[in-house]
């Protein structure tokens, strides 16, 4: 059967395998022989046995044999226990909720995953008005207890979904915080096309990442920001660090 969440099964004459790195490899009589006058590129992409590197990370479902693509291979890492760490996959699940504008997952080389969240000011602001919650700024709304509880529900819903997936269950979010400011291209945190600059964010907010992994309940921080007129300033905040419920792996039969 055709499924929207997988690529499907390989057609006749095509072999698939998953490299130790998590990258999807294929082999077929129809694959290219070599790059024109570029043996180095050929060697980097195709091994001596004819397996071609796709550049994508994924896995083959054990029961259905269908291929599921997770992310670009270069963006996928490993957690401390060797399980796959695919941040964009989890971040996209979080951003499926209209209330979450942006998410950044951390966990490569760690025992567990933690996350930063940006609320969507428009969506959450409308919700706040309907629920008679007053606020004067993004920072004030993001720190509201009811907003934090809403984000916790979203995170735990994603965790429940991840717990159904043998390969991705290790990426459940154990702790999170709502950032006191939106990630901004003017501050170098995201690109103009809204792609998170993960390494930059991790370094800039190292105190917040460390606090999440250490198990602190709150953390005070001071962040340099760029205003609309180009002037620089500082934003101070005390952030609540939230524990999220995680779930045991739920074995399920993949759809046929």
Q: Which residue ranges define each predicted feature?
A:
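C-terminal boundary motif of the adenylate-forming
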Residues: 55-57, 97-123, 162-163
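Adenylate-forming
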Residues: 31, 66-95, 124-145, 169-170, ...
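Conserved ATP-binding/catalytic segment of the ANL
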Residues: 10, 17-79
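Short Gly/Ser/Thr- and Asp/Glu-enriched loop/turn motifs at secondary-structure junctions
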Residues: 72, 108-112, 170-174
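Gly/Ser/Thr-rich phosphate-binding loop
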Residues: 1-2, 15, 101
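Active-site loops of AMP-binding adenylate-forming
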Residues: 1-6, 38-41, 121
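Conserved C-terminal "lid"/linker of ANL adenylate-forming enzymes
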Residues: 102, 127, 156-255
């Amino acid at each position: 059967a055709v499924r929207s969440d997988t690529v499907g099964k390989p057609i006749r004459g095509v072999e698939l395998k998953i490299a130790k790195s998590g990258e999807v490899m294929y082999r077929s009589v129809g694959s290219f022989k070599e790059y024109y006058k570029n043996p180095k590129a050929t060697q980097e992409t195709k091994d001596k046995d004819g397996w071609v590197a796709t550049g994508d990370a994924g896995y083959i479902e054990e029961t259905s044999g269908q291929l599921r693509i997770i992310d670009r291979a270069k963006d996928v890492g490993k957690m401390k226990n060797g399980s796959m760490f695919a941040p964009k996959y989890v971040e996209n699940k979080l951003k499926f909720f209209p209330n979450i504008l942006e998410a950044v997952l951390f966990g490569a080389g760690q025992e567990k995953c933690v996350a930063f969240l940006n609320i969507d000011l428009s969506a959450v602001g409308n919700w706040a008005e309907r629920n008679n919650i007053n606020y004067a700024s993004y920072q004030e709304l993001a720190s509201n207890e009811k907003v934090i509880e809403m984000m916790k529900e979203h995170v735990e819903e994603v965790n429940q979904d991840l717990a159904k997936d043998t390969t991705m269950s290790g990426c459940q979010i154990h702790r999170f915080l709502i950032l006191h400011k939106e990630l901004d291209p003017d501050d170098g945190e995201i690109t103009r096309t809204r792609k998170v600059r993960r390494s930059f964010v991790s370094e800039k907010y190292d105190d917040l990442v460390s606090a999440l992994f250490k198990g602190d309940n709150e953390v005070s921080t001071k962040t340099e920001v760029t205003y609309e007129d180009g002037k620089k300033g500082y934003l101070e905040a005390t952030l609540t660090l939230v524990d999220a419920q995680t779930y045991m792996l739920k074995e399920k039969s993949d759809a046929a």
